[in-house]
C-alpha cells in the first residue's frame, strides 16, 4: 500500500466525513482514528481488529461543551505525559528562539480552552499508536490485516458509488452491461 497506517484524529462530531481515510483503507492501510465521520463506517466494514480506536465519543464531547465541564488544565495537571508534551511547546525545542511565541500561543490555547479537546484524547491516541506499532512489527500478521482491509472495504469503491448513484439518485441504467 501507499501507506501502512492512516491517522484520522479528528475530534468526534467535528469531521465532515471526508474520503481520504477511505482511500487509505482501500489501499490496505489500517486506521488509527476517532469514532467520527467515515471512520465509523470504515471500522464497521473492516472490523475492530483492523482499526485502532481512541478518543472521546461525540456525545461525551457535546455534554462537556454543554455543561462547560471540560477543564484542559486539569488534564495537564493529572498527566506527566501530557505535561512533558505541553512543556516542550513552551521551550525552543521545535524552533529558533524568535519563533517560540508561536508555540507558546498553542500551549496557552490548549491549556485555557482546547475547544477540540486535544488534550483529552492525547494519552489514548498515544496508546493506540503504540498498539499499531506493536502489531506492525509482526510483518506477516500486518500483511494479512492489510489484505483483510482491502477485501472488506469494497463498499467504498468509486465503482460501487457510481452504480448506486446511477440507480438511486439519477435513475439511469448502464448503456451496456
How does the language model describe each region?
Residues 1-146, 150-155, 160, 164-177:
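Catalytic binding pocket for nucleotide-activated donors in carbohydrate/polymer assembly enzymes
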Amino acid at each position: 500500500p501507499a501507506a501502512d497506517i492512516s491517522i484520522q484524529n479528528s475530534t468526534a462530531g467535528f469531521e465532515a466525513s471526508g474520503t481520504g481515510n477511505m482511500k487509505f483503507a482501500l489501499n490496505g492501510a489500517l486506521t488509527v482514528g476517532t469514532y467520527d465521520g467515515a471512520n465509523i463506517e470504515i471500522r464497521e466494514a473492516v472490523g475492530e481488529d483492523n482499526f485502532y480506536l481512541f478518543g472521546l465519543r461525540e456525545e461525551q464531547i457535546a455534554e462537556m461543551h454543554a455543561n462547560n465541564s471540560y477543564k484542559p488544565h486539569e488534564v495537564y495537571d493529572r498527566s506527566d505525559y501530557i505535561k512533558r508534551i505541553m512543556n516542550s511547546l513552551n521551550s525552543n525545542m521545535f524552533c529558533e528562539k524568535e519563533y517560540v511565541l508561536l508555540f507558546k500561543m498553542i500551549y496557552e490555547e490548549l491549556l485555557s480552552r482546547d475547544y477540540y479537546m486535544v488534550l483529552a484524547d492525547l494519552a489514548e491516541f498515544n496508546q493506540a499508536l503504540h498498539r499499531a506499532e506493536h502489531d506492525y512489527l509482526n510483518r506477516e500478521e500486518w500483511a494479512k490485516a492489510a489484505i483483510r482491509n482491502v477485501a472488506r472495504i469494497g463498499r467504498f469503491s468509486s465503482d460501487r458509488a457510481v452504480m448506486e448513484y446511477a440507480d438511486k439518485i439519477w435513475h439511469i441504467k448502464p448503456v451496456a452491461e
